[in-house]
Amino acid sequence: MLGPVGTPSKRLTYAVLVAWGTLAVQAAYAQCTAAPREVTTEVNNAPYDGRFTFARLGYETGPGGYYYHNLPAWAHGYPSSEKSLMKILDGVTGIVKPRMDRTNVVFIGDPEMFNYPLTYMVEPGYLTLNPLETKALRDYLLKGGFIIFDDFRNSRGNDGWGNFVEVMRQVLPEGRLMPLDSSNPVFHSFFEIKDPHAFISCYDGAGRAEFWGMFENNDPSRRLMFVANFNNDIAQYWEWSDTGFTPIALSNDAYKFGVNYVMYSLTH
């Protein structure tokens, strides 16, 4: 059973007793090195029917890409992570009733991408795009799509951040990456996340979690087009939340980010 999520902004009254400290941090680091719970790249998409369906972005892993447990970069944590998040989203919001039987994978450049207000991508540090994919991603963002970029850092000789910045420069050359602080509406769209940077990353020695984004017209008062969870792997906590392998508080915090991202994408 999934643990309770926490307390949303003036809506719910879940209470979680948290034992923070060394054990929590060690559990977080250990979780990042665990084998995936469900190893598959088989895609069995549900047909579009208007319901909210979680969609993961597929892409070709770039040269030197990280094939974790023989999975291509886009598939890390698929589909356990998003299935767990959909259970929480269905249970706590009272508003969004997501499709529960399946989550989808849509490859960048597929016109189906535009059916999804929110998409999710892991390992953008290994992302490469051809010109058609670059245009498709640009059009998606400018037409109202919202992307969660998750699970990347600088490691194993890979400049994950540098690669991500270069790809986004190609997609939105006029755009400017900006750090997201606690005042950004994405951290208050459902749950009140008072200090996002206090989130404990499961990456050992990666430094503190960082959150970056781009806004329409580079104006922070306008719509946020994507959020990049750098030095972070929020979905790893979703994937393992019902196993007892990680402290409930860490999974709760990760779910708060996920729910907020979904709610923001549906209301902006």
Where are these regions (language model features)?
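N-terminal secretory signal peptides that target proteins for export/translocation
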Residues: M1-K10
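Extracytoplasmic/secreted envelope proteins and their assembly/folding machinery
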Residues: E82-M86, T134, R138, W161-V165, ...
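An acidic, glycine-rich "communication" segment
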Residues: P36-E38, G62-Y68, N154-T243, L250, ...
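Bacterial N-terminal signal peptides
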Residues: Y14-Q26
